[in-house]
Amino acid sequence: MKESIQVTLEQLRETLHYHAVRYYVEDSPEIPDVEYDRLMQQLLKIEDENPELVTVDSPSQRVGGQPLDGFTQVTHEIPMLSLDNAFSDDDLDAFNKRMSDRAPTANLETFCCEPKLDGLAVSLLYVNGTLVQAATRGDGATGENITENVRTISSIPLKLQGEGWPERIEVRGEVFMPKAGFDKLNEMALKKGEKVFVNPRNAAAGSLRQLDSRITAKRPLAFYAYSVGVVQGAELSNSHYQRFLQLKAWGLPMCPETKQLSSLEDVKAYYQDIMTRRDTLAYEIDGVVIKVDDIAAQETLGFVARAPRWAIAYKFPAQEEITLLNDVEFQVGRTGAITPVAKLEPIFVGGVTVSNATLHNADEIARLGVKVGDSVIIRRAGDVIPQIVAVVQDRRPETAKDIVFPDACPVCNSAVERVEGEAVARCTGGLVCQAQRKEALKHFVSRKALDVDGLGVKVIEQLVDREMVETPADLFKLSAGVITVLDRMGPKSAQNVVSALNKAKDTTLARFLYSLGIREVGEATAMNLAQHFKTLELVQAATHEQLVEVSDIGDIVASHLTSFFSQEKNRAVVDQLIELGVNWPAIEAVADDQELPLEGKVVVLTGSLSKLGRSEAKAALQALGAKVTGSVSKKTDILFAGEAAGSKLTKAQDLGIEIRTEEDLIALIS
């Protein structure tokens, strides 16, 4: 029996040593913190039950990894130890009882609490108020000299402020990278085609341990003090919290969430509050640190081999876990975006059981190098959708399969389009795809499109949910009798909707093109298309080269147009709409030598337009040769005034400028 336990211990120690080096020395962890904690807890349990098997080189007897050879070594005068962990209120109660049993007369009623920052522990030595040395924690006894790098961190004072500081004082704290700085750093790396950091902790560690301090200087690092080590030449407060305030007065930053609390129940409430607000904080944390506030009590309680007896880290539920990627399904969003969704072996992470996670897009799949069958690290933070952040490469099975993005929409089988320079792949079946149905119909009847009065969002949603319509053409097949089955839709309201649909059949080519919901074809672009090609048939048949000749249309919009009209299903819906009576007046072609009706005219738009969108009206006027300006002057030739026109109309009247209505504008366009 003892032999099998011995083998288990040796395997655990070897595994923990390996991952400690990956985490503390190489800044390249392969497993999440929760997995390392679990292995350590297993080791401690076996060693506690079999004390004769404890060895001097066990991970339980040390704090971290050895320093790299690239930095000179610094021996800590007082060891920089780590903390024991609590994972529940029961663990916290047990911690408190251990202290009470060991020091029954000590002042254990007051606590100093702070968020447990996810960064790199450092020691700062000030002599006569000047920073002379900075070191990493290393293995707790020996760290790395990172003085030149630390000098580049703006939140760390090179000289202490105020007065009264000790002749020699060692300040300990955490160097970290705020979330905003981390996001910006990775964004810049992507633009340069460089490797991105997995998380802010890795970014902070990698930045702080650069051999070239000029690189560190460019990284958005920050620092919060959390304790004091060596002190010579002055007496400090007997309160841990008051020492924080003294350090702050000397110019050393402390975490603003640090609190002095008077009971263990207050500590538990503090933990819950910080956990609730975790995702709103500017920095990554993975728990709270709880310390006895009284320094004399700390000295009485003392230390075990690897941690103080007077402090503990109360960890949050794990936000990262390892699980299996069983499959990948592709979902189609309301705008046609196709998103790969990882189907996972269910795992409890971030307080919930997770079985699905987003993989975002094909670029993200390539960046992760993930395959079906991989063991993956899954992360869930707060309300953020769970996502895969890394692959555990050494667990990849031989049967792992590549993830292949579909060429056809998994919902409607239309072609999938991915424009060069865009990360997202999209379904091109905008008018027929069930996944996009509600948004396509809402857009089709909107005021700037066919403007169907009375056919609002809730009515559209009911029509789709009850499977009464599939495409925009189906709207014109509805009868008043059918519509009355909808909620809050009586006979009169239903008849009004039918009348509005019939009225909407009389439109313009520009509005019709806009109503189709083709990506990036807005009112102005639709108007430019209508004025350039004159007929729907020519728009549908236009090649990429012909489309880019149209004003304001580039390669991307041209690709969207050709993709849309190349789909037979989309063209079939367009044909149905025409057959059902949707029509518009013909746009007369203008001969090359014929002057445009508003050629050279300076035109101003004012007031509210009920039939045209402002950008649509502006594009139409420009197509007729006008120069559209924003203010009325003596140079203005025509003012088109909509409803509730104000000072521009008054000024135009005073100047004797020709004034026309929106109806005049529509007639001119037609």
Curated annotation (Swiss-Prot):
Residues 593-670 form the BRCT domain. The keyword Zinc applies. Pfam families: BRCT, DNA_ligase_aden, DNA_ligase_OB, DNA_ligase_ZBD, HHH_2, HHH_5, Nlig-Ia. The keyword Cell membrane does not apply. One of its GO terms (biological process) is DNA replication. Disulfide bonds: none annotated. It catalyses: NAD(+) + (deoxyribonucleotide)n-3'-hydroxyl + 5'-phospho-(deoxyribonucleotide)m = (deoxyribonucleotide)n+m + AMP + beta-nicotinamide D-nucleotide. InterPro entries: BRCT_dom (IPR001357), BRCT_dom_sf (IPR036420), DisA/LigA_HHH (IPR041663), DNA_ligase (IPR001679), DNA_ligase_AS (IPR018239), DNA_ligase_CS (IPR033136), DNAligase_adenylation (IPR013839), DNAligase_N (IPR013840). CDD domains: BRCT_DNA_ligase_like, LIGANc. Its cofactor is Mg(2+); Mn(2+). GO terms for cellular component: cytosol. One of its GO terms (molecular function) is DNA ligase (NAD+) activity. Belongs to the NAD-dependent DNA ligase family. LigA subfamily. DNA ligase that catalyzes the formation of phosphodiester linkages between 5'-phosphoryl and 3'-hydroxyl groups in double-stranded DNA using NAD as a coenzyme and as the energy source for the reaction. It is essential for DNA replication and repair of damaged DNA. This is DNA ligase. It comes from Vibrio atlanticus (strain LGP32) (Vibrio splendidus (strain Mel32)). The lineage of its organism: Bacteria, Pseudomonadati, Pseudomonadota, Gammaproteobacteria, Vibrionales.
